[in-house]
A protein has these predicted regions:
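Pyridoxal 5′-phosphate
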Residues: 1-424
Length: 424
């Protein structure tokens, strides 16, 4: 038996230690194959309860008195992420703001901590918001931004960042190096510990973006020697659209760094309302303003579920689920003109794979409108499909790929117009 046999895949679900969690998510249409948890996770039922309880049992009756226990919620919620998904000890993570804001804050703090260095390194396959922010920072501070050219969606492993890729660009002028842990398009996984060690050896700092990694693979920020990290919570974290992001600052360097936006939540004696800013000597020194409490309740309920499931089991299912996808691609989709833009080694990828096809945009729209399959499209020619380990069954993946094969083999997708939506 093999992955090509649906009964074999059903048996995988029967033996799956995470299968029980699927019933904890809202599934409006049981016939839908939702393979886009890498973009937005499903809604956990317990989140509905958590938000309702906050509105009716806290905000409603407590009013402003609630701030006595709400005020510091960004920190223990950050500790929950560290324990459940990031391999980080307490006191190093805040759940706050957006990934873009946190990225800007930590980038500027890092370059200010290396004032005699003028070079920042990233890669052209990095997520656009990170690249755009770096361009602005480089202009603002007169820095040399080096962009490693690795964005070729037709080369399967070209986007993966390794020490060998980075080495030619390193010298004693490098202040900051920043990459994705999992590349947003291809799903390629960077060498986190090795690259961090490599950059620290020349005196630079490394900022990782874990947005496409958290909740899909096992991370160990502390033992990997990571300096700085940011990420979102709404993908494999299942915390909802627009949910608060997070930032990680190693205790080693917290007192060394100063963020550019000095909000009052970072003030040492916050409620003395003093005339000058004095940074709190803890992770709170990186918090700008009030925690987003409704969003934080969503994060808490979702990451408590991840903690219950165990990130090791989650990572195993990600690896097996993407292995299933790749085998189905080899037998069903490659003969139909698809290419694979994701590393085959499970240690070199995350929870999604990228299927390249010249008609990718049209196929993606047709899958949603004709086949009840939801993946997503990324320019110029990629369809991303993912297994979200707590919410997705193996057979949902199998059925989704069977529908992709049927749609493309029949040519029916050619009758569908490409979407006019700004969102793909």
């Amino acid at each position: 038996m093999s992955y090509l046999d649906r009964n074999f895949v059903l048996d995988l679900d029967t033996k799956d230690p995470l299968a029980k969690f699927k019933s904890e998510f809202v599934v409006d249409d049981p016939q839908l194959c939702y393979l886009d948890g890498n973009s937005l996770g499903r809604l956990p039922k317990r989140t509905i309860t958590a938000v309702t309880d906050f509105l009716t049992k806290e905000w409603g009756p407590e009013l402003v008195s609630g701030w006595s226990h709400w005020v510091d919620e960004a920190q223990p919620t950050g500790d929950l992420l560290g324990k459940s998904a990031l391999g980080a000890a307490a006191g190093q993570i805040l759940v706050c703001d957006t990934t873009s804001v946190n990225f800007y804050q930590l980038c500027v703090a890092a370059i200010k901590a290396r004032p005699n260095r003028k070079t920042v390194i990233t890669d052209s396959a990095n997520f656009p918001t990170d690249r755009y922010i770096l361009e602005g920072i480089a202009r603002q501070f007169g820095l040399n931004l080096i962009m490693i050219q690795n964005e070729d969606p037709n080369v399967a492993t070209n986007e993966r960042i390794t020490t060998e890729v980075l080495a030619p660009y390193l010298n004693d002028d490098v202040a900051l190096v920043t990459f994705q842990i999992i590349q947003y398009r291809s799903g390629a996984r960077s060498e986190v510990k090795a690259i961090t060690d490599q950059v620290r050896a020349i005196g630079g700092l490394v900022l990782w973006d874990a947005s496409h990694a958290i909740g899909a693979i096992e991370l160990d920020l502390d033992n990997s020697g990571v300096d700085l990290c940011v990420g979102c919570t709404y993908k494999y974290g299942n915390s909802g659209p627009g949910s608060p992001a997070w930032l990680y600052v190693s205790k080693r360097i917290q007192n060394e760094l100063q963020v550019p936006i000095q909000g009052w939540f970072a003030q040492e004696a916050q409620f003395e309302m003093g005339p000058k800013f004095e940074k709190a000597q803890s992770i709170r020194g990186f918090q700008i303003a009030s925690p987003s409490l409704i969003g934080i309740r969503c994060v808490q309920s979702a990451f408590n579920m991840i903690n219950e499931a165990g990130i090791t089991q989650i990572a195993k299912k990600s690896a097996q689920g993407t292995e299933l996808m790749i085998e189905l691609y080899d037998h069903w989709l490659k003969p139909l003109g698809f290419d694979l833009n994701t590393p085959r080694n499970s240690d070199h990828r995350g929870g999604h794979i990228s299927l390249v096809h010249p008609d990718a945009a049209q196929i993606c729209v047709a899958l949603r409108t004709l086949s009840k399959v939801i993946p997503d499209y990324r320019t110029p020619n990629s369809i991303r499909v993912a297994i979200s380990p707590l919410a997705t069954s193996y057979v949902e993946v199998w059925d989704g790929f069977a529908r992709i094969r049927e749609l493309v083999a029949s040519g029916e997708y050619k009758k569908v117009k490409e979407s006019g939506s700004r969102v793909t």
